[in-house]
Amino acid sequence: MLSDYQRYRLYEILPGLSIWLTLILSIILSFVRPLWMIYFIILFDIYWVLKVVNFVFYLTLSWSRFRQARKTDWEDKMRHELTNWQDKHHVVFLTLYNETWDVVKSAIQSVSDAAYEKDKMVIVIAGEEKKKENYESILFNVQKEFVDCFGDIVGIMHPKNLEDEIPGKGSNLHYAERQMQKYIDEKGWDYERVIETVFYIDTICHPQYFSYLTYLYCTHPNPTKSSYQPVALYNNNMWESPALLRIMAFGTTFWMLTSLARQDALVTFSSHSMSFRAVVDAGFHDKRIVSEDSRIFYQCLIADDGNYEVTPMYVPVSMDTVRDDKWWTSLKNLYKQQRRWA
């Protein structure tokens, strides 16, 4: 009998193993059973042609919706069509490690420039004790430059070496959410009226992001049972990145657009938003997972017995590619990023 860990590892290995077996056996069988391989390649080609047709159809559909959403004044729609938007509070989490002030400033400036009432927004700078000096410096600059731009700016430092966690964004976010739960309780806010947004620290959001998000949240039949997923772009440093990184970045965006049009298969990815009620019910982001952005969807799906979904947002958030000054290091960073996402 296999232990729980051994079964977990087996299931974890299977996707990668199947890919490598397909590649290796394709070469071996070309010599051993060439006729088999001819049939296999024909079927494989037909399969991929159908996948491309399917991909292009949903990509075109999403692109049309994306263009329409960008032309819409969501703030105006929110103010004139809704009566319940003013009781919503936005809590924006920005997890920090060793990023520079320029990166953090650009992200917070984009939130500050958003078309939404800033007194309804709380910015959370979630830093690490391992990089205490950088965290304190960044927090000081944020509070100095943006003191009058938001309802509040909260700094939370994640202690190092806590038990039963893996250091990373997931554990940092888990700790910050638990601390913010106390903050929200002190304010007396209803969890169902608090919308949590988790941005990567380099995220530049669309000016209409929070108005659009609020509109979707207020018009959704069951807003606490849904996450809200924007289109991920990697435009911040696109033209400073090697060609291969640019191609992969556009590929990720195309995949994201296709996924948005297929809501039945859509899960959260990268920067996104959700109800704080859902976060609490799911037990917060998993502190034993580094790449937590898609994991939280499955936590919510299980917590709500399958009654959970992702609502597409056809506006962009832009982030950095994983470029480095050295070309080879950029490729290694890209491989690690793709492996982490997988």
Task: Show which residues each predicted segment covers.
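Internal catalytic domains of large membrane-associated glycosyltransferases
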Residues: 67-326, 339-340
